[in-house]
């Protein structure tokens, strides 16, 4: 599974500036999911790869990022 890492409180994606390989996104994806997850900056948000099927990713139901 793949997807944007999401803030559970406000429903927003984790923003990033440096597109492509990005240490911040990789670190956040691994902290949220597990150490074998991958992560990079895509469309100015952190995209996580190699996730388990039950992983919660953006968009969250009933949460609108403001």
Swiss-Prot record:
Cellular compartments annotated: Secreted
> Could you tell me what this protein is called?
Beta-toxin Cb3
Q: Which residues form the LCN-type CS-alpha/beta domain?
A: 1-66
The processes (GO biological process) annotated in the record are: defense response; envenomation resulting in negative regulation of voltage-gated sodium channel activity in another organism
* Cystine bridges: 12-65, 16-41, 25-46, 29-48
User: What keywords are annotated for this sequence in UniProt?
Assistant: Disulfide bond, Ion channel impairing toxin, Neurotoxin, Secreted, Toxin, Voltage-gated sodium channel impairing toxin
Presence of the UniProt keyword tRNA-binding in the record: no
Protein source organism: Centruroides baergi
Instruction: Respond yes or no to whether keyword Endoplasmic reticulum is given for this record.
Output: no
State the domain notes: Has the structural arrangement of an alpha-helix connected to antiparallel beta-sheets by disulfide bonds (CS-alpha/beta).
């Amino acid at each position: 599974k793949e997807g944007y890492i999401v803030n559970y409180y406000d429903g927003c994606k984790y923003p990033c500036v440096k597109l492509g390989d990005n240490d911040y996104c990789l670190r956040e994806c691994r902290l949220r999911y597990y150490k074998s997850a991958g992560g990079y900056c895509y469309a100015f948000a952190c995209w996580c790869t190699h996730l388990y099927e039950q992983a919660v990713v953006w968009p969250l139901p009933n949460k609108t990022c403001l």
